[in-house]
Regions:
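Residue-level signal for pocket-adjacent positions within structured domains
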Residues: 12, 40-41, 46, 54, ...
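Short beta-strand-to-loop capping motifs
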Residues: 15, 64-70, 111-114
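Short helix/loop segment flanking the catalytic signature motif in cyclic-nucleotide metabolism enzymes
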Residues: 66-83
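Flexible, gly/pro- and Lys/Arg-enriched active-site loops
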Residues: 51-59, 79-130
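N-terminal beta1-alpha1 ligand-phosphate binding loop
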Residues: 2-37, 43-47
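Short, charge-patterned binding micro-sites
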Residues: 41-71
Length: 130
């Protein structure tokens, strides 16, 4: 049986609460364990200064390339991944804080194949609201 169609996605990871290095390592493993996911690459870790709210510890960041099921259409495939990312953030204990504030784990869907994501959901314009 042939594999279902897949899409290459790039996910940004960041953390600055607790042990960010260990958190990002565990998050990469959790991303690889998502149903149907195939990890394709992981960048090195980058130490970055906070933006916006600067009175907080610096961040550790990375980017992961992962092939995921495309879904019946690009919108549903991207939304499924976005919701999975938000679920992982919650599982890692992410707390609701001010914009650009500290993060136990921040996962951002940077690229989903060649698709531009259009989400039909009320938001305030921030990815944190999904």
């Amino acid at each position: 049986m042939a594999d279902a169609p897949r899409v290459r996605a790039y996910v940004g990871l960041g953390a600055n609460v607790g042990d960010p290095h260990r958190t990002l390592q565990a998050a990469v493993s959790a991303l690889a364990a998502l149903p149907g996911a195939r990890l394709r690459g992981v960048s090195r870790l980058y130490a970055t200064r906070p933006v916006g709210v600067t009175d907080q510890p610096g961040f550790m960041n990375a980017v992961v390339a992962v092939d995921v099921p495309a879904g019946p259409d690009p919108d549903s495939g991207a939304l499924a991944l976005l919701l999975a990312l938000k679920g992982l953030e919650a599982a890692f204990g992410r707390q609701a804080r001010r914009r650009w504030g500290p993060r136990e784990l921040d996962l951002d869907l940077l690229v989903f194949g060649r698709h531009r994501l259009h989400v039909e959901r009320p938001t305030s314009g921030r990815s944190d609201d999904l």
